[in-house]
Amino acid sequence: MTGEAGGFGPGAGEAGRTSASDGSGGALGDEGSGFRKVARVVLLDPQDRILLMHGYEPDNPDDSWWFTPGGGLEGDETRAEAALRELAEETGITDVQLGPVLWRRMCSFPFDGRRWDQDEWYFLARTTQTEAVPTDLTELERRSTTGLRWWTSAELSAARETVYPTRLAELLRTLLDEGPPRAPVVLAPEIV
């Protein structure tokens, strides 16, 4: 993941829906002045398991959480391009069918000695490639991630560990039961 942090801050409840976007960088509400533009991937395998990364605060490995692959946009790339690039860098998975934007959230959180303010878009993606091995982690990512894991919806719902966005288990269950929303769901902002 380039651009240092991947957006480890929490996300919370549904605030409503907004217009659809193809992830090409077009508007989906206000971008938020000064917010880092981030693309994240809700990657599902043929068994509908979701791939999550395990991260932690570099100076405090006991402060850990699970989160979706993704990171900041580079140059003039679109959110969809960033999603695919970040997924390849962080998981080694390149055989992917990228789908629609499912959710969007604004978050602000402390990580590695600074505050991160992010505007995150979550893309649905499918793959049959289940072996995941990071190929191009930044120095910060190497100091703050410990691996990847495929989770079933039931495992995620029963997890006692911290997972971001905080409603991911509920959001995944809804996605699997109802399919992608007609327009991206805007999650309530969360400041940690």
Language model regions located:
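Local beta-strand/beta-hairpin segments that build beta-sheet-rich folds
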Residues: 2, 101-102
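Tryptophan-centric aromatic hotspots in well-structured domains and transmembrane helices
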Residues: 35, 66, 103, 148-151
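N-terminal strand-loop-strand
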Residues: 2-6, 11-67, 95
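Unchanged
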Residues: 73-97, 105-161, 190-192
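Short connector loops at helix/strand junctions that flank enzyme active sites
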Residues: 36, 63, 68, 116-120, ...
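Hydrophobic (often cysteine-bearing) scaffold residues that line and stabilize catalytic clefts
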Residues: 35, 75, 79, 164, ...
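Short active-site-proximal "capping" loops at secondary-structure junctions
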Residues: 57-59, 103-106
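Charged phosphate-binding loop/patch that engages nucleotide di/tri-phosphates or the phosphate backbone
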Residues: 166-192
